[in-house]
Amino acid sequence: MEIVLILHNIRSTYNVGSILRTADGFSIDQIIYSGFTPAPTPHSTLLPHLAEKITNQIHKTALGAEKTLKSSFSQNLTKTLTYLKASGYQIIGLENNLTDQRLYQITNQKLKARLSSKIVILLGEEVNGISSDLYRYIDLFIEIPMSGQKESFNVSIATAILLFYLRYGINLNQS
C-alpha cells in the first residue's frame, strides 16, 4: 500500500517532528506540508534564521527523519488534492466526530472494498481538525474512538495509531 501524508495547518513543530519520525518508522512514501504547517529546510518559506530555528525544533522529535522522507510543500492544497485524486489516490481524513468509519470497524474486506492501494491521509490542525472546505475531497473519514474524558488524541498519536493499523493491524481482523 502506497501512503502519502498531508500535514495541513499543524501548528506545533514537535507534532510535525513526531509525525515525521513515525512516518519513517512505517515507511511512508511521501510527506506533503501545506498551510501554516512548519516545514523543515528546504521547504520552509521563512527567513533563513527562522527556518533554521524551525528545522532545529522539528529535528528534536524527528531525530533525522526529516532528512530520510520524500517531502514537498503544497502552495495550493485543493490543487494538490485534485491532482492526487486524478492520479488514483483515495483521500482519508483522520478526524473525530464525523464518524464515517471507526478505525476498529475497518476489516481487511472493508478496506479492500473502500480504498485503492494508493492512499493519502489528510491531517488537520490540532484544535479544529480538518477545515470543512476540504471535506469534498475526502473519500473516507476515519475516527479513532475515545473512551476517556478528552475529545481526541494528539495529532501525532492519532497518526501513529492509524499508520500501525494500515500497515500491520488490519491483518489482525482477518477471518
Stretches found by the model and what they are:
Residues 1-96:
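RNA substrate-binding interface of SAM-dependent RNA methyltransferases
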Residues 80-86, 104-115:
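Short amphipathic alpha-helix with an adjacent loop that forms part of the alpha/beta core around
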Residues 24, 132-175:
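Structured adenosyl-cofactor binding patch, chiefly the S-adenosyl-L-methionine
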Residues 36-37, 126, 146-150:
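Short, acidic/turn-prone active-site loops that include or flank metal/cofactor-
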Residues 14-15, 101, 129, 153:
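Residues that form or flank phosphate/diphosphate-binding pockets in enzymes
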Residues 96-99, 125-128:
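Short glycine-rich anion-binding loops that position phosphate/pyrophosphate groups of nucleotides
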Residues 18-19, 45, 104-106, 133-136, ...:
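Short amphipathic alpha-helical segments
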